[in-house]
Swiss-Prot record:
Protein name as annotated: Riboflavin biosynthesis protein RibD
Region annotation (Deaminase) ranges: 1-146
Pathway it works in: Cofactor biosynthesis; riboflavin biosynthesis; 5-amino-6-(D-ribitylamino)uracil from GTP: step 2/4; Cofactor biosynthesis; riboflavin biosynthesis; 5-amino-6-(D-ribitylamino)uracil from GTP: step 3/4
Positions annotated as active site in the UniProt record: 53
Biological process terms in GO annotation: riboflavin biosynthetic process
Source domain of life: Bacteria
Family annotation (PANTHER family): 2,5-DIAMINO-6-RIBOSYLAMINO-4(3H)-PYRIMIDINONE 5'-PHOSPHATE REDUCTASE, DIHYDROFOLATE REDUCTASE FAMILY PROTEIN (AFU_ORTHOLOGUE AFUA_8G06820)
Origin species: Synechocystis sp. (strain ATCC 27184 / PCC 6803 / Kazusa)
Obligatory cofactor(s): Zn(2+)
Length: 368
């Protein structure tokens, strides 16, 4: 007999089909099993579309009666942009529901499970729970903290440099690593850089055709000391948002507006204020691809929860060559920020280290 764990892993595989497309909604996959046979399966494709359970029920049809439904996230029990999934499950005659994890959304949070049990449906909760939570880590964080999940990505040489002393950085890593980054961008709703990166690198910041939708390209600059011409100002390729302060260069602001680049003027430009703005724009997870100065600000404010660090087998030297993270004010090694749940993998000739910033992953606050 096929185990509950196997069917739940199938739900996770289905859910991953829509990575980068569901924001601000979670990733949800569902499987309906009659005996040992899968009679229906589906996933939530994007916000506003039916949830994964509904697609699975549609495919199962009459064979859903008396069957077991598997879903990685608790079925909703409220009327949103789509009807409650619990009522559809009840009406279909499902006998048992196996849930990967409870939905952290206060609108759901156990209410879906209670409704199903009230209707006489057997409910099992917590199958492959850790994997289910990891898949929707950005959704869970956003619900809990009312801001997007922050990811900091950088690439450096063996001696810890992200560019030469002359600011040349093309390329620190291999084409394989860069393709991986393009995939990561396709899973994020926004990519953030600072003015220095625009001036030095003139980046494009798209997913280079890896995904269907490019992330919003966000430039942070208090002064608006930005080049008149840049790839980011081409709005036919992807949309760009420039965020600045009231003391900015008004000529540059006017120039950007003429180019139809969206601008936003804040009283005070901080990483936290930016993340709050992106939360209002329905972002689930945001990628920080900035230089060291802005990265240090983002980390210090608790707006980075996860780190992807590429290590390239190169040495370039240079006392003045920039490093990934600027000044954090630490004086002793005991103050260092530790990464948890560390994972490393080889991508081409480079190594990728992935982990979570201790103190920034659970409570959303920096421990600096």
């Amino acid at each position: 007999m096929i185990s509950d764990q196997t069917h739940m892993r199938r739900c996770l595989t289905l859910a991953k089909t829509a990575i980068g497309k569901t924001a601000p909604n979670p990733l949800v996959g569902s499987v309906i099993v009659q005996g040992d046979e899968i009679v229906g399966q589906g996933f939530h494709p994007q916000a506003g579309q039916p949830h994964g359970e509904i697609f699975a029920l549609w495919e199962a049809g009459d064979r859903a009666k008396g069957a077991t439904l598997y879903v990685n996230l608790e079925p909703c029990n409220h009327q949103g942009r789509t009807p409650p999934c619990t009522e559809a499950i009840i009406q279909a005659g499902i006998a048992k529901v196996v849930v990967g994890m409870v939905d952290p959304n206060p609108l759901v949070a156990g209410k879906g499970i209670s409704r199903l049990r009230q209707a006489g449906i057997e409910v099992k909760v917590g199958v492959e729970e850790e994997a289910c939570q990891r898949l929707n880590e950005a959704f869970c964080f956003r619900i809990k903290h009312q801001r997007p999940f922050g990811i900091f990505k950088y690439a450096m040489t063996l001696d810890g440099k992200i560019a030469t002393a002359q600011a040349h950085s093309s390329w620190v890593t291999s084409s394989s690593a860069r393709h991986w980054v393009h995939q990561l961008r396709s899973q994020c709703q926004a990519v953030i850089i600072g003015g220095n990166t625009v001036r030095r690198d003139n980046p494009l910041l798209t997913n280079h055709g890896v995904g269907e939708v490019n992330p919003l390209r966000v430039v942070l600059s208090r002064s608006l000391d930005l080049p008149i011409e840049a790839q980011l100002w081409d709005q036919d390729v992807a949309k760009t948002l420039v965020i600045t302060e009231k003391t900015c260069d008004r000529n540059t602001l006017s120039h950007l507006e003429k180019l139809e680049v969206e601008t936003l003027v804040l009283e005070q430009l901080t990483p936290l204020a930016v993340m709050e703005e992106l939360y209002q724009r329905n972002c689930l997870q945001v990628l920080w691809e900035c230089g060291g100065i802005l990265a240090a600000e983002a980390i210090a404010m608790g707006t980075v929860q996860k780190v992807h660090a590429f290590l390239a087998p190169k040495i370039i030297g240079g006392v003045a060559a920039p490093t990934p993270v600027g000044e954090l004010g630490f004086q002793q090694m005991t103050q260092a920020l530790n990464l948890t749940d560390l994972h490393c993998q080889a991508i081409g000739p480079d190594w990728l280290f992935t982990g979570y910033l201790c103190g920034n992953d659970d409570n959303g606050q920096s421990n600096i």
